[in-house]
Amino acid sequence: MGGCNPFLKAARTLCPRIMPPLLFLSAFIFLVNVLGGAPGHNPDRRTKMISIHSLSELERLKLQETAYHELVARHFLSEFKPDRALPIDRPNTFEKWFLILRGQQRAVSLKTFGIRLEEVLVNELTRRKHLELTAAMQIEESTGQASGRRRGNVVQRLFGRIRRFFSSRRDEPSLPREFTRRGRRGAVSVDSLAELEDGALLLQTLQLSKISFPIGQRLLGSKRKMSLNPIAKQIPQVVEACCSFIEKHGLSAVGIFTLEYSEERVRELREEFDQGLDVVLDDTQNVHDVAALLKEFFRDMKDSLLPDDLYMSFLLTATLKPQDQLSALQLLVYLMPPCHSDTLERLLKALHKITENCEDSIGIDGQLVSGNRMTSTNLALVFGSALLKKGRFAKRESRKTRLGIDHYVASVNVVRAMIDNWDILFQVPPHIQKQVAKRVWKSSPEALDFIRRRNLRKIQSARIKMEEDALLSDPVENSAEAWAAVLAQSKPFDEGSSEEPAVPPGTAHSHDDEEGAGNPPIPEQDRPLLRVPREKQAKTGIGYFFP
């Protein structure tokens, strides 16, 4: 017994030293397992995600830079080059000369099917502007203002067309003079689109009146000035019309995209869209005809909706675990040109709604409602080869990168994952928001200051509107949830986190801190709320301006 006394004394001596670390460790394990994380950690990340459409051009550029570096670190970009422009077909010079002399260039180039996606959007903008000019000329002729206008002779018009042909760039779609900055005679200047009642409509109108950024190109690698306004959605008219019709009339159609359709009716609809007519898809149309028209649009596109230089990168995600695949798909979507990502989002949204009605259900009246039998796997089998096409860059890349599975099987797996998670692909998670904020701060602190002030005013306007609605009508039942939704859609990045970039004292701070959550601080009175900073030349050679 006497030999055990030294051990007992040693245990009694070490107990006071060991117990505090053990208690701390047990408390930490309790927080992780029961509360969902350490103090200050929010386990529900989806409530803090924001849409990429709420980001400005500058933030979208920094988002693409962040996605590029993340994918390079994961070895997902073998042949991708950020400064490489998307391929554009070279026009036939002799044929173009002949059409210009006859004045038929505009009539034959404004198509919808069988061309690249950016060309479809440019043709729609050109047609819309041409209709506006035609209507204005008709008004002038009806009022007699154009009766005395002198017309140039045939020789002058011929030399004018030849001069415009040689002076225009051949690698870009030709636009009317009214579309260029030189042709605009008026301008609109606003401090913030959030102060307007219909800011989205005004933003779309302003971006239709002038091409601020070449359609079909990435922001990454550009040396132009970046705007601090969001980018208007760029979706072809045929895609929007077909998706809206299917969501309204085709969710319960059994075997949509797979059953037989009328080839004659699809050809008529295709010709109407190619001619630039105002096509209205009403109740008289067949759902399967409209579905076939939408499928033909993506199948006959010269380029791929998922860019050619990212072909193998998308296929490589099929070899990952589901959570890792979703994260990689998010980064790849960020790298896509705005027109491609917007069109992809619209298509995936419609396809996801179809999958929600694939099984039988009980209606409101208690009757059995049959499902459409189109799961995400079935839709991926239909659209897999139409969305992921192997082009020139993809063929060169596939020689160096070999997959363990067939390319068609991988494409089906990728499209299925995108349909199932369409609402997450176009959201920016908090950790990416922090990196975007840091990159904006490094390039232009004044731009970060302006973006935060504008979003602060947006939140204040939303709060005032909610208070007015509460006074005019009954109180909102879920006011806290509604206010949280407003905050989630208004923040350009995760401002509530503790890892914010270092901002000087003169800049605005977060509106959603612990002491004043829901009560934005009042800006200081000794300086204007929205100041216009001077142009700043960043290290990358990119300037920034405030619209």
From Swiss-Prot:
Molecular function in Gene Ontology: GTPase activator activity
Domain Rho-GAP stretches: 226-426
Site location (Arginine finger): T258
PROSITE patterns: RHOGAP
Keywords (A to Z) from UniProt: GTPase activation, Signal
Residue numbers spanned by region Disordered: 493-547
Annotated protein name in UniProt: Rho GTPase-activating protein 36
Organism: Ailuropoda melanoleuca (Giant panda)
Phylogenetic placement of the source organism: Eukaryota, Metazoa, Chordata, Craniata, Vertebrata
Gene, per the UniProt record: ARHGAP36
